[in-house]
UniProtKB/Swiss-Prot annotation:
Function recorded in the entry: Carrier of the growing fatty acid chain in fatty acid biosynthesis.
A GO CC term assigned to this protein in UniProt: cytosol
Domain of life: Bacteria
PROSITE patterns given in the database record: CARRIER (PS50075), PHOSPHOPANTETHEINE (PS00012)
One Gene Ontology term of the molecular function aspect: acyl binding
Upper taxonomic lineage: Bacteria, Pseudomonadati, Campylobacterota, Epsilonproteobacteria, Campylobacterales
Gene3D superfamilies registered for this protein in UniProt: ACP-like
Organism annotation: Aliarcobacter butzleri (strain RM4018) (Arcobacter butzleri)
Protein name: Acyl carrier protein
Length: 76
């Protein structure tokens, strides 16, 4: 649960959205109003927060909060 909270905090900070809107199945672009630059900045913030490197080909597959959590769990 802590990982979910940490990822949500990064999403809220980067996308400047309402924390109540951020669910595991929230899509960054469709549900949270991000654009492609926002998503790039979000991925960079996740890399910094969790001390991981996310290659571009993997970053393109991270479309939801759950995708981000799964990637971090498998690569951190």
């Amino acid at each position: 649960m802590a990982l979910l909270d940490d990822v949500k905090a990064v999403v809220v900070e980067q996308l400047d959205c309402d924390p109540a809107e951020v669910k595991e199945d929230s899509k960054f672009i469709e549900d949270l109003g991000a654009d492609s630059l926002d998503v790039v900045e979000l991925v960079m913030a996740l890399e910094e927060k969790f001390d991981i490197e996310i290659p571009d080909e993997d970053a393109e597959k991270i479309l939801t909060v759950a995708d981000a959590i799964k990637y971090i769990e498998n690569n951190a």
